[in-house]
Amino acid sequence: MVMPLRDAAEDVGRVIREGLLHPVFQPILDFRAQAYLGFEALIRGPASSPLHRPDQLFAAARSTGLADALEHACREASLRAFARLGLPGRLFLNVTPGCLLDDRLLNGETCRLLNDLGIAANRVVIELTENQQITDLPGMHEGLLHFRRRGFQIAIDDLGEGFANLRMWSEVRPEFVKIDKHFIHGIADDRMKYHFVRAM
């Protein structure tokens, strides 16, 4: 469903202002330890709205200049829900590379919220998503260094999906990678895929 631009801006703005975001948590399992490694925070908009689906919610936010504000609101809602539910392990938070230098991330606001919620920074993993082109590599490094110094860890989503993604992996050197499903499907019978994944 395509929404008129003005309606989209009003609807996304209302979702942000009124706290109408609903985090859901996808478990990440550690098979060796037979325990939860953590949970990835995913977001949904209001159930009765076209913005319930995250692809439509974020597309509307991007088209109306509200993408950074929405991403910030998603992080806050996810952190609060994670603490309220008392979930074990790490929290994987999706962050676009362009938002790494967002003042609300760098000025200590996120760390203060973590402190208020009783969540240690070393339980939070910043998961870089590649849904936008990286135009400021030095800036991205600066942002990552800022968070690593405070105890956060870094993950990359869908490693192997494209050349830019592989470059990001070599530049960022993340603590965690999520490997694109192409390299996992049939890995038991494909030595090339097996060695690629082992090399990660």
Describe the role of every protein-language-model region.
Residues 8, 71, 140, 165, ...:
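The cytosolic transmitter module of two-component sensor histidine kinases
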Residues 24-26, 42, 92-96, 127-129, ...:
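A cross-family glycoside hydrolase active-site/sugar-binding cleft signature
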Residues 147, 196-200:
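Alpha-helix-loop-beta-strand connector modules within alpha/beta enzyme cores
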Residues 114-187:
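The catalytic core of metal-dependent phosphodiesterases that act on cyclic dinucleotides
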Residues 3-60:
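Active-site core of bacterial EAL-family cyclic-dinucleotide phosphodiesterase domains
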Residues 47-51, 75, 79, 158:
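Short acidic-capped amphipathic helix/loop micro-motif used as an active-site/signal-coupling element
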